[in-house]
From Swiss-Prot:
Pfam families for this protein: Vinculin
Name of the protein this chain belongs to: Catenin alpha
Main location: cytoplasm
Biased segments, Basic and acidic residues type: 878-890
Species name: Drosophila melanogaster
Subunit comment: Interacts with arm/armadillo protein.
Compartments reported by the entry: Cytoplasm, Cytoskeleton; Cell junction, Adherens junction; Cell membrane; Cell junction
Domain of life, source organism: Eukaryota
Length: 917
């Protein structure tokens, strides 16, 4: 037995000494807590038992029953403790001592409790029982903690075996000895990982659980690399890099083992978690948003102004760094600068309003408007910063394997100069991944997601030099089989780690931002690709086409991963269909056209390149990505969409990238307002309308939305499979929604001609609906249903005609003294009203078509129904709700957590009369 020190007791488990303090009753595992919980409940209930009422005399039956329950529970603890003591000779003496203490305190508790149950009104007896209960719980807790240390002992025993195996691996001098030691290490490490997994599930402290999980993953992941690196070192001991390579992996494995040891003994390997915490810039914006709202009475011109201005300048400095980064597009940089200036101005306006309201208790309308404007401007700045971050992600995570593969190819050739060049490129690539990952973290409030990204980035940072070392070893020993195996192992480890980092980054990047940015990037690349074709640059064409292929593939992968968060439904079906079309049809055609074009340019035979066909294929890629984005956004309400994430800022292909055929020329190049600077399309003009006119349009849109709710309840419930009436109705509804979006300066319709073409599509769909519905009416006997159905068809024809007339909406824009005056309220409201009326007519037509089809069908006259009326299966809720970035802190509030009370602390709250004196 080892001697106890002043702080605690050293318990000798065979050759393993565990230090523990008998006075420290901290419960670290859930199993101890759950085992102790029933006894705590029984004891505290007994202590809280009230005496009989004044009218009645005698014993408390309830107290007597509780005493018996406590005695039985104590007896169970004694039996289990003795069993554990005799099964584990290393701890028998300590366990039996703890069991004796439980017996002693249990007997004292039993006597005190029975005396109390005989006389529940006695304060003295209640106080005696409280002290006895406290002593009993302390003894039982000590017994359980000691029993829990048996599991720790077994874990540490396995851990020491693994440590011995690592020492043998380190000192192995031959391949045979190394392989024998490695097999033994593999078995023992596997057993240690299992025991550590069990311990991880038991631990209460989330930080310790995370540390143990990371250590287990590290031990498991690095085992293969440890083998190959050790084989290289044993085979080529003359190479310094081989030792460096082996020592790095050995240290990683040893660190993992040490972490398991620390956690098993209740020590965190990291006093402060360096990876935790939300992004700095996101947190600064949140703090600023909270700071701008205050009571005007508390506003201080000197203190408040200085504080808010300093906070804002700090945010703008960080935004400027992001704007000046390499991958930030010029257009994005200009937008960030513009938003920073707008936020500055909004803050000055807000501070002026606070100055004017300092003597008022309630906010004036001007102050409320200034606060709203301030919030809007910070939200706009956030959005541009998020887009800038996604710009970097889209570029840096586009091709993550090429730098490594180039490095490996250079290493295989044995060309040291080339390897040095490729190593520099690979290092810059790794540094860029880490830099972008940290940039993504800076704009995220998702603390768990940020922690994962930071940890994955740290792994990339530490692994990069060792990948280069493995390549350098292969360079000087290109024919060595063990060097080749080692390089393959490091390549696989790198690819896995990059995939983990990519997925972690995607998790804290909203898919809406990702798709909006990817769409713009693909548009840029399509322009470059066509330009390369037109100037005959085969190399640039191949490189740019590769970027398009990579971006498109990544869009497909990210969207498929996002759809995994949903249960299968009509929404996911449509999105995945759009992905399938892009991947299997559009990209296949594009790849063929690129191959043909590159081949023709390489052979200097420009005449063989069908430029128009190539441009068509390129345009289809852009349209395919755009269609995926449109499908993803279909389940968003207008409130969920911010204006910059919708379709409005995306411009179509520029003139030089369009086909020269007549099919691709037309209104797309037309400036609808050639005399007005800053406005090109009718949709842009709609955004410039006065706030008063916008409010009136919003009122009309609200009426349209109410009609849309009726449409959803009456039409959307039907399955459109085998029912063209429902299909046409939904198609018309979608176009009408795009039209109403246009009146607010949103949506995919940009020009007046777009709206006119949309009206034509509605009219065509209305004609088809009329024809189909009349066939149903003809089969229906004369009745009020038939008459009403035909009447509603006449309404559809009328309102389709009205929409065609009102679709020629074009806001009148005048420039008076440098100020744009936009007037188009009447035409916009007319279009919305016509759409609302048409939707109402469509709803009624569907209702009466159903009645006519099912209620009045004559027997024997129709071989099969014209349409099939089948209820659509209810759409399932997403397994994980898409998280909007502004919701993380702005709308989601953390509920008060239930505090888990330590049993000893619970009992210490009871105070006996004797203690109080």
């Amino acid at each position: 037995m080892l001697k106890p020190d002043k702080m605690g007791t050293l318990t000798d488990f065979g050759q393993i000494a565990l230090k523990w303090d008998p006075k420290n009753l901290e419960i670290r595992t859930m199993s101890v807590e759950k085992t102790l919980e029933p006894l705590v409940l029984q004891v505290t209930t007994l202590v809280n038992t009230k005496g009989p009422s004044k009218k009645k005399k005698g014993k408390s039956k309830r107290a007597s029953a509780l005493v018996a329950a406590v005695e039985k529970a104590t007896e169970n603890f004694i039996q289990k403790g003795e069993q554990i003591a005799y099964e584990n000779p290393d701890i028998t003496q300590e366990m039996l001592t703890a069991v004796d203490e439980v017996k002693k305190t249990g007997d004292a508790m039993s006597i005190a409790a029975r005396e109390f149950s005989e006389d529940p009104c006695s304060s003295l007896k209640r106080g005696n029982m409280v002290r006895a209960a406290r002593n009993l719980l302390s003894a039982v807790t000590r017994l359980l903690i000691l029993a829990d240390m048996v599991d720790v002992h077994l874990l540490l025993k396995s851990l020491h075996i693994v440590e011995d195996d690592l020492n043998k691996l380190k000192n192995a001098s031959s391949q045979d000895e190394l392989m024998d030691n490695m097999r033994q290490f593999g078995r023992n490490a596997g057993e240690l990982i299992k025991q550590a997994a069990k311990r991880q599930q038991e631990l209460k402290d989330p930080q310790l659980r995370d540390d143990l999980a990371a250590a287990r993953a590290m031990l498991k992941k690095h085992s293969t690399m440890l083998l190959t690196a050790s084989k290289v070192y044993v085979r080529h001991p003359e190479l310094d890099l081989a030792k460096v390579n082996r020592d790095f992996i050995l240290k990683q494995v040893c660190d993992a083992v040490n972490t398991i040891s620390d956690v098993a003994q209740g020590k965190s390997s990291q006093p402060t978690d360096i990876y935790s915490g939300a992004g700095e810039l996101a947190a600064a914006l949140d703090d600023f948003d909270e700071g701008i709202v205050m009571d005007p009475m508390t506003y201080s011109e000197k203190r408040s102004r200085q504080l808010l201005e300093e906070r804002l300048e700090s945010i703008i400095s960080a935004a400027a760094l992001m704007a000046d980064a390499d991958c930030t597009r010029d257009e994005r940089r200009e937008r960030i600068v513009a938003e920073c200036n707008a936020v500055r101005q909004a803050l000055q306006d807000l501070l002026s309003e606070y100055m004017s309201n300092m003597s008022q208790k309630d906010n004036s309308p001007g102050l409320s408007r200034a606060i709203d404007q301030m919030c809007r401007k910070t939200r706009d700045l956030r959005r541009q910063l998020r887009k800038a971050v996604v710009d970097h992600v889209s570029d840096s995570f586009l091709e993550t394997t090429t730098p490594l593969l180039d490095l490996i190819e250079a290493a295989k050739s044995g060309n040291e100069k080339k390897v040095r060049e490729k190593s520099e490129i690979f290092t810059k690539h790794a540094e860029k991944l880490v830099e972008v990952a940290n940039l993504v973290c800076s704009m995220s409030n998702n603390e768990d997601g940020v922690k994962m990204v930071r940890y994955a980035a740290a792994q990339i940072e530490s692994l990069c030099p060792q990948v280069i070392n493995a390549a350098s070893i292969l360079t000087v020993r290109p024919n060595s089989k063990v060097a080749q195996e080692n390089m393959t192992t490091y390549r696989q480890a790198w690819e896995v780690q990059v995939r983990i980092l990519t997925e972690a980054v995607d998790d804290i990047t909203t898919i809406d931002d990702f798709l909006a940015v990817s769409e713009n990037h693909i548009l840029e690349d399509v322009n470059k690709c066509v330009m390369a074709l037109q100037v005959g640059d085969a190399r640039d064409l191949r490189a740019t086409a590769g970027a398009i292929q990579g971006r498109s593939s990544r869009v497909c992968n990210v969207v498929e991963a996002e759809m995994d968060n949903y249960e299968p439904c009509i929404y996911t079906k449509r999105v995945l269909e759009a992905v399938k079309v892009l991947r299997d049809q559009v990209m296949m055609k594009f790849d063929q056209r690129v191959g043909a074009a590159v081949g023709a340019l390489s052979n200097n035979s420009n005449k063989d390149v069908d430029e128009n066909d190539f441009i068509d294929a390129s345009r289809l890629v852009y349209d395919g990505v755009r269609e995926i984005r449109r499908a993803v956004l279909m389940n968003r309400s207008s409130e969920d969409l911010d204006t910059d994430t919708e379709f409005e800022p995306v411009e179509d292909l520029t003139l030089e990238t369009r086909s020269r055929s007549s099919a691709h020329t037309g209104d797309q190049t037309v400036d609808e307002y050639p005399d007005i600077s800053g406005i090109c399309t009718a949709r842009e003009a709609m955004r410039k309308m006065t706030e008063e006119d916008k409010q009136k349009i919003a009122q009309q849109v609200e009426l349209f939305r109410r009609e849309k709710l009726t449409f959803d309840s009456e039409v959307a419930k039907w399955d459109d499979t085998g029912n063209d009436i429902i299909f046409l109705a939904k198609h018309m509804c979608m176009i009408m929604m795009e039209m109403t979006d246009f009146t607010r300066g949103r949506g995919p319709l940009k020009t007046t001609m777009d709206v006119i073409n949309a009206a034509k599509k509605i009219s065509e769909a209305g004609t088809k609906l009329d024809k189909l519905t009349r066939e149903i009416a003809e089969q229906c006997p004369e009745s009020s249903t038939k008459k009403d159905l035909l009447a509603y068809l006449q309404r559809i024809a009328l309102y389709c005609h009205q929409i065609q007339i009102t679709s020629k909406v074009k806001a009148d824009v005048q420039n008076i003294s440098g100020e744009l005056i936009v007037s188009g309220l009447d035409s916009a409201t007319s279009l919305i009203q016509a759409a609302k009326n048409l939707m109402n007519a469509v709803v009624l037509t569907v209702k009466y078509s159903y009645v006519a089809s099912t209620k009045y069908t004559r027997q024997g006259t129709v071989s099969s129904p014209i349409v099939v009326w089948k209820m659509k299966a209810p759409e399932k809720k997403p397994l994980v709700r898409p998280e909007k970035p502004e919701e993380v802190r702005a709308k989601v509030r953390k509920g008060s957590q239930k505090k888990v009370q330590n049993p000893i602390h619970a009992l210490s709250e009871f105070q006996s009369p004797a203690d109080a004196v």
